A protein has these predicted regions:
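A penicillin-recognizing enzyme superfamily signal
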Residues: 1-6, 14, 66, 115-291, ...
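Mid-domain, small-residue-enriched loop/turn segments at the edges of structured enzyme/sensor domains
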Residues: 46-52, 83-121, 135-137
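C-terminal functional modules
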Residues: 309-328
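Extracellular glycan-interaction surfaces
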Residues: 20
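Secondary-structure transition/capping motifs at alpha-helix termini
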Residues: 23-31, 98-100, 128-133, 257
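Second-shell loop/turn segments in exported
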Residues: 1-8, 50-55, 63, 74-80, ...
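Conserved catalytic neighborhood of penicillin-recognizing serine enzymes
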Residues: 28-88, 132, 144-174
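Short active-site loop at a secondary-structure junction
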Residues: 1-17, 30-33, 37, 106
Length: 329
């Protein structure tokens, strides 16, 4: 039964746990800037590890939300370097991941095996705004007279505050609405949803894990013998091209006749429109902007005044000297 016992590498579908750890433990938020660039990590007694982005292209400074939408490997590796693999493992356990996880930096790219059941369970914790529900198969057993012999009375555990999870949930909605999982929308799926693609080296594993308000579903595609998945056009099958379409077709059937329910926005959350490449409040100089969900106490700064072309004689000297020292976040 591959759904429960097939420990396959999740690839980038593991990244949400890295991002959540960085936001909860190290003060990052969806508008935080990380430089997307080639990374070289020295390993004692071995060759350096040089994780690459899928396209081998790099965006430079970019906000976390956009980095997740584009599934940028270098950003995820930089985050786990800062927060440590131990903290990411601890976070994954809070989401219900029970498989052994390697205590190493490559964990950021999903190099430890998990089951689809674990991923569906973990992603349901995001959809439930931090409430973990242990998976179960049998809800109730009755005898021939209808008397209950067994009932499952498990109640969810609030492992994270709702306002801690919602920024991540919003980022994962971005994956579907305009990121690597956009095929879901292109296929006509209308329900509010979040998710994440995953593809492993040499196209041996293709994942799409996603959720709506009603269901959390994990789709894995691959061969038992680890053979690479190559289509008739000699293209490797990715999470977006193989698993996400299956997820979409399944969820369309599962949600047939159900209302399109939006995710509730918890108390303590606000939305800000920011510059994708500076992390500052959007302004007339912004090339690309994006709405991000952040905790109310999060301060998003305007662009530093010295970077805005102005007529200097229109500014009072006291105002200029005060604001030119405001750093770019």
């Amino acid at each position: 039964n591959r759904a429960v016992s097939n420990n396959r590498l999740p690839g980038s579908s593991f990244k949400p746990f890295v991002y959540l750890t960085a936001m909860e433990r190290n003060g990052f938020n969806p508008a935080s800037i990380v430089k997307d660039e080639p990374v070289v990590i020295e390993i004692l007694g071995s060759s350096p590890w040089e994780p690459r982005n899928f396209s081998d292209k790099y965006a430079g400074d970019i906000i976390l939300k956009k980095a997740m939408m584009r599934s940028l490997n270098s950003v995820s590796v930089k985050l786990i370097q800062e927060v440590t693999p131990e903290k990411v493992i601890k976070a994954a356990r809070q989401f219900g991941v029970t498989s052994p996880l390697g205590n190493n930096l490559s964990l950021a790219l999903g190099t430890s095996g998990v089951s689809p059941l674990e991923m569906a369970s973990a992603y349901s914790t995001i959809a439930n705004l931090g409430i973990y529900n242990e998976p179960y198969f049998v809800e109730r057993i009755e005898d021939f007279k209808g008397n209950p012999l067994y009932e499952n009375f498990y109640h969810g555990v609030q492992n994270y505050a709702p306002k801690s999870i919602y920024p991540l949930l919003n980022m994962m909605q971005g994956v579907i609405d305009g990121g690597t999982g956009r095929i879901v929308r292109q296929m006509g799926f209308k329900h509010p949803a979040g998710g994440k693609t995953g593809t492993t080296n040499n196209f041996k594993d293709s994942w799409f894990d996603g959720f709506t308000k009603d269901f959390s579903t994990s789709v894995w595609v691959g061969y038992d013998n680890n053979e690479p998945m190559i289509d008739r056009h000699a293209h490797g099958l990715t999470g977006a091209s193989a698993a996400a379409p299956i997820w979409t077709l399944y969820m369309e059937k599962a949600l047939q006749g159900k209302n399109q329910i939006k995710f509730s926005i918890p108390e303590g959350i606000k939305f800000e429109k920011v510059d994708v490449y500076t992390g500052t409040l959007a302004d007339s100089q912004s090339i690309e902007t994006m709405n991000v969900a952040v905790k109310e106490e999060t301060v998003i700064l305007p662009r530093a005044i010295e970077s805005i072309p102005v007529e200097l004689d229109l500014i009072e000297p006291s105002t200029t000297s005060e604001l030119t020292n405001v750093p770019n976040p």
